[in-house]
């Protein structure tokens, strides 16, 4: 994905295309440096702004962290 025009608050923050378990694709701000194939958790809505280093960033989806291990019962 190439995004040349952004709102001022996004600056040079990375953006990632995420796919949920139903196949829906969304774009999220990525302050943690996730890579393709990583499992991540996200913050959405107004909480997404506070997951960014600068809470003034205008976003409604932010990657909050990379999941290193996940066990499902």
From Swiss-Prot:
PROSITE patterns: BMV. The keyword ATP-binding does not apply. One of its GO terms (cellular component) is carboxysome. GO terms for biological process: carbon fixation; photosynthesis. It comes from the Bacteria. It is found in: Carboxysome. Keywords: Bacterial microcompartment, Carbon dioxide fixation, Carboxysome, Photosynthesis. InterPro entries: CsoS4B, EutN_CcmL, EutN_CcmL_sf. It holds the Pfam family EutN_CcmL. Residues 1-68 form the BMV domain. Probably forms vertices in the carboxysome, a polyhedral inclusion where RuBisCO (ribulose bisphosphate carboxylase, cbbL-cbbS) is sequestered. Has been modeled to induce curvature upon insertion into an otherwise flat hexagonal layer of major carboxysome subunits. Has not been identified in purified carboxysomes; it is expected to be present in very low amounts. Belongs to the CcmL/EutN family. CsoS4 subfamily. Homopentamer. The tight homopentamer forms a pore with an opening of about 3.5 Angstroms in diameter which is positively charged. This is Carboxysome shell vertex protein CsoS4B.
